[in-house]
Amino acid sequence: MSRVRIVKGKIYEAVEGNLSYYSETDIIENASIIYSENSDTEILYGGNPEKPPMAEINIAADAIVHFRPMRNWKGKEYGFDWMRIKDTGLFGDDLYSDLTGTYDKYPSADPAARFTTSPTLFTDLKREYSNPVYSIPWLLKDRKPTSYYPSWICVEKNKKIKLSLKVHIKDKEKLPTELVIAYDKTLCEITTSLGQGVENEKSDPTKNTHYAKIVIKKNESYKLEDEIELKVIKDITTPEILKVLCDGNEAGYLKLYNNKVKRLNVVCVRVKANIGNGENKGSIKGKTELENYLKQSLIKTNIVEEDLNILRNIDSTPNTDLSLPSISNGSGINVGGNIRGKSLYDYLDEKLKAMFPNFGTDGKADGTGKYDKFLRLYFFSETAYLVHNGATIGVGGIGTPIGAGRGTMFSGITDADVAHEAMHAIALGHSFGTQESISAITPYLFKYKKTENVMDYAHLDSKDKYSTWKWQWDKLRNFNLLTE
């Protein structure tokens, strides 16, 4: 949101305390004659500006409605993200205030790593769901009002999907008269168990807003599973908001994410190689999981398959590059090693480009490759490892560096972990780490193996991982190989 203030004369501001200005983008000040600043002591300029404090608004309604995903949702139908407050019973739905934080050591490499919650990280995370934060004065926890956070959904235009609701009633002996979802009829269509949303000329004389009724029960808290059928019928480029009204007061929100579909070309490459233990060719897996994970942020994939035979050199002599001690121990590939100073990933890209070149008008290879603008996933049948602090650690796959557009998969990797490594190659870091892991790529960190997010390691505890967060959608949709 922007604000422009135009005056013909002078502007005077006088305050007894501090005066602060905050902006999410730029602050520009112009003067036609003189712009002056005076201070009794000094005027300071510096980087690393503070983030604006979060505003808080009390919800006046006598009911609260949370939007939640459909029953048995596993991320296949749409992307959905909400501030977890432990109200669904799903794995990963623990209080994010208890799960956001950092480790003193990298937890996947050191079981003795200790976790510390971070109120600062949690405060920053709140902004992804809502700013301002809404407060429910009558719903208390530890004698304090609880907070309300809108949920996010990313769903394709004209696709019908189902959503669930979680409802809290202030006083079950004094029930609300009406609980409805109010929405722009040109934005979406909504049907609940009480019927399709309709206009209400008294509430909206222009008849642009429709209202879908929600069941009111004589319970303090209840769940309405698969209560809503939603179809977005409009192109969304900036977030839209659906509001729940309780007797005219706002009682809940659902934010609709950008629904413009983006596309990603992917090439899955079976590598035929010999690292000194015989000729082997990799097998492709994980395509369905990758498609499902990316669909949550409305990225659709076009996946092709190729074979890359690097058994022999151009002169037909045996290619022994991958048996060099700098890249292999004879039974597995060292993902941190090199081939005459070249990383494994650069080496594979070079071989792929040589096998599938683009040609200029003169019929000669022009130096570019057919798959340069594809996400490139290489599959080996060999095992792999890395050396960390003198210890050899087995590796199923790796997508590095983050956002580089290529990943390498090895023997033993699961379908879900192929997609996990591909997400590294596109834009995402792990969901856990140390203080040093926090960056523009990974602004938030969580407790290890405690979320269902695809960038966690919950599978090591036999838990499903299948979801992505709204802030991850932002990262994924900015990948430089995407097309529209």
Model regions and ranges:
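Right-handed beta-helix
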Residues: 1-57
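Propeptide-to-catalytic entry region of secreted or membrane-anchored zinc metalloproteases
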Residues: 58-371, 381-387, 392, 477
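Extracellular/periplasmic catalytic domains that process cell-envelope and extracellular macromolecules
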Residues: 362-373, 394-403, 446-449
